[in-house]
């Protein structure tokens, strides 16, 4: 499994529309609107690098209103949330 964080700039009037459209693309697990240098942060979880390349260069490239993107690959997750999820599989409260 490959996890990527994709930083997106979009036309101001299209930010919400871009976010909605991105959230419906298979392989994209989360879309956040954020403050700062970028407008949106996208978390993608795909099978391999080829699938990531397809996602970024074909599926995301077709979303109207995206003006720039920067893709970062995640090497390792240190989030407590992710670790709790791994150990909770099969257990119920």
Predicted regions and their residues:
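A compositional/biophysical signature of low hydrophobicity enriched in polar/charged and small residues
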Residues: 1-93
């Amino acid at each position: 499994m490959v996890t990527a964080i994709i930083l997106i700039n979009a036309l101001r009037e299209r930010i919400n529309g871009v976010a909605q459209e991105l959230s419906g693309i298979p392989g994209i697990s989360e879309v956040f609107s954020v403050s700062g240098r970028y407008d949106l942060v996208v978390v993608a979880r795909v099978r391999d690098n080829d699938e990531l390349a397809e996602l970024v260069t074909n599926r995301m490239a077709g979303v109207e209103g995206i003006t720039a993107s920067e893709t970062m690959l995640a090497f390792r997750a240190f989030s407590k949330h992710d670790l709790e999820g791994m150990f909770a599989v099969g257990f119920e409260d």
